[in-house]
A protein has these predicted regions:
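Bacterial N-terminal signal peptides
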Residues: 2-12
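Bacterial signal peptide processing site
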Residues: 14-15, 19-20
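N-terminal "mature-domain start" segment
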Residues: 26-51, 96
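Short small/polar-residue motifs
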Residues: 45-53, 119-126
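Extracytosolic low-complexity repeat regions of secreted or lipid-anchored proteins
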Residues: 84-143
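Active-site-adjacent structural elements in enzyme catalytic domains
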Residues: 146
Length: 146
């Protein structure tokens, strides 16, 4: 039996029943790719967004983690379309985004803020952002089952 660490919890997982995939985004990510991933996580990424990477875990959590960077000027509109209450963001990782691994690096963020939102069908959306750089906002998205 293997152990998978997701969102700070150790989850037992049979090798056959749980599949983890992580990949760095290809150099040329199309707008169609971003739209598809956006639909999967419930967030409309702007055309200016750059996909940094995607990680999926199939199994008990059916988790997807996505890191995107977008121009700071596009952040307010993106946030207004997200299914979260912006006033609920709090400083720090708070156990919502899990450990750093490869492209996934919320613990290296200069000014990380996070929020958790309950979604229909027992799903959860954890959203974090780092606006510590003047012109770019890094967005960390984790969608998983409760």
């Amino acid at each position: 039996m293997a152990m998978v660490v997701a969102i700070g919890l150790a989850i037992p997982c049979e090798n056959v029943a749980c599949k983890s995939t992580a990949k760095q985004a290809p150099r040329q990510t199309t707008q169609q790719d971003l739209e598809s991933i956006g639909k999967e996580v419930g967030l409309p990424f702007p055309p200016s967004a750059k996909l940094i990477g995607v990680h999926r875990e199939r199994g008990a959590d059916d988790l997807i983690a996505v890191k995107v960077e977008l121009p700071a000027k596009d952040w307010p509109v993106f946030l207004s379309l997200a299914p979260v209450d912006a006033s609920l963001f709090r400083a720090g990782e708070r156990g919502l985004l899990g450990p750093d691994q490869g492209f996934w690096d919320p613990h290296k963020a200069q000014n990380l803020r996070t929020v958790e939102a309950s979604l229909p069908n027992g799903r959860v959306l954890n959203l974090g952002y780092d606006d510590g750089r003047a012109s770019v906002v890094a967005v960390y998205v984790v969608k998983h089952s409760k």
